[in-house]
């Protein structure tokens, strides 16, 4: 939905067991205002979203940045890390919008058409138009049929 911004930067993990007791051996963590008490180290480690699972590989981000810049340009570690955060957040933002659409349509698979729709719905119309052209060319080259039924997902997909 245009205008509704989601933040996926630090998603709250789904906790199975809350223990709001005050045992001194417990560890307390705060996630967006929610204090969660963890009973042991193993449970604590399983709840944390690993940074490498949340972010694109920094080497890939750096390589893309270097390809855009003049050959003699340098990119600082801070610039790579900042861009890594930005692009990872952007991907989560667009994918979340596409996923919401699929959920409303009772589909499990997010496809390229859903991503194009999400980009346009979020106000990135120019990018969505170019992405649609690219997706069409990709499908032609791969021998796939373009999606023209308007729902955003292929009719023959087994999980739709």
Swiss-Prot record:
Superkingdom of origin: Eukaryota
Subcellular location: Nucleus
GO CC terms of this entry: CCAAT-binding factor complex
Tissues where the protein occurs: Expressed in flowers and siliques.
Matching SUPFAM superfamilies: Histone-fold
GO molecular function terms listed in the Swiss-Prot or TrEMBL record: DNA-binding transcription activator activity, RNA polymerase II-specific; DNA-binding transcription factor activity; protein heterodimerization activity; sequence-specific DNA binding
Keywords: Activator, DNA-binding, Nucleus, Transcription, Transcription regulation
Main location: nucleus
Region (Subunit association domain (SAD)) location: 83-94
Residue ranges flagged as DNA-binding region: 56-62
InterPro entries: CBFA_NFYB_domain (IPR003958), Histone-fold (IPR009072), Transc_fact_NFYB/HAP3 (IPR027113), Transcrpt_fac_NFYB/HAP3_CS (IPR003956)
Protein task: Component of the NF-Y/HAP transcription factor complex. The NF-Y complex stimulates the transcription of various genes by recognizing and binding to a CCAAT motif in promoters.
Family, as annotated: Belongs to the NFYB/HAP3 subunit family.
Record note on quaternary structure: Heterotrimeric transcription factor composed of three components, NF-YA, NF-YB and NF-YC. NF-YB and NF-YC must interact and dimerize for NF-YA association and DNA binding.
Protein name: Nuclear transcription factor Y subunit B-5
Originating organism: Arabidopsis thaliana (Mouse-ear cress)
């Amino acid at each position: 939905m245009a205008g509704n911004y989601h933040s996926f930067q630090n998603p709250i993990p789904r906790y199975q067991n809350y223990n709001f007791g005050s045992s001194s051996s417990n560890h307390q963590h705060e996630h967006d205002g929610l204090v969660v008490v963890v009973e042991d180290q193993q449970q604590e480690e399983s709840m944390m979203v690993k940074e490498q699972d949340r972010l694109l590989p920094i080497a890939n981000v750096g390589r893309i940045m270097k390809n855009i810049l003049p050959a003699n340009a340098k990119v600082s570690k801070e610039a790579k890390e900042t861009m890594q955060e930005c692009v990872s957040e952007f991907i989560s933002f667009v994918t979340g919008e596409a996923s919401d659409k699929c959920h409303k349509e009772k589909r499990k698979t997010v496809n390229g058409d859903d991503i194009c729709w999400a980009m346009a719905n979020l106000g990135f119309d120019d990018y969505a138009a170019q992405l649609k052209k690219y997706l069409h060319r990709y499908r032609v080259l791969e021998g796939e049929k373009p999606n023209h039924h308007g729902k955003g997902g292929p009719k023959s997909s087994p999980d739709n």
